[in-house]
Design a protein with these regions (language model features):
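Structural motif
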Residues: 40, 47-49, 56, 72, ...
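Short, conserved beta-strand element in jelly-roll/cupin
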Residues: 23-24, 35-50
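A short, N-terminal "cap"/entry segment at the start of jelly-roll beta-barrel domains
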Residues: 1-17, 65, 94
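Short acidic-glycine-tyrosine-enriched beta hairpin
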Residues: 54-70
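Ligand-binding loop in jelly-roll beta-barrel domains
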Residues: 69-94
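Conserved short histidine dyad/triad with adjacent acidic residue
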Residues: 6-8, 18-35
């Protein structure tokens, strides 16, 4: 299970970036999925692993993962405390 927080809703419109906090509880994961824009995952606390196109990297507090448009990505919480991330990506124009 995870909890998501939209932290950029108060930004005046139109905005060009979205920022969300995502807390992955112990044992939680965001399964592999394709992305159609670049994304940055910044770790606030906890430990985990991120996979992009089959390449696995460990992430922990203070580290960031830059994920590229067209990649298939996923992230998984590891350890005894939740993995708390800021996820940033561009807003798709409507």
């Amino acid at each position: 299970m995870s909890t998501a927080f939209r932290i950029s809703d108060a930004v005046p419109q139109p905005k060009s970036m979205e920022f969300r906090r995502r807390d992955l509880h112990v044992g939680a994961a965001i399964g592999s999925h394709p992305i159609d824009h670049d994304e940055v995952y910044y770790v606030l606390s906890g430990e985990g692993e991120v996979v992009a196109d089959g390449v696995l990297a460990l992430i922990s507090k203070g580290k960031a993962a830059y994920l590229y448009k067209g990649s298939v990505v996923g992230v998984r919480q590891m350890g005894s405390e939740p993995l708390s991330l800021i996820i940033a990506y561009p807003v798709t124009p409507k």
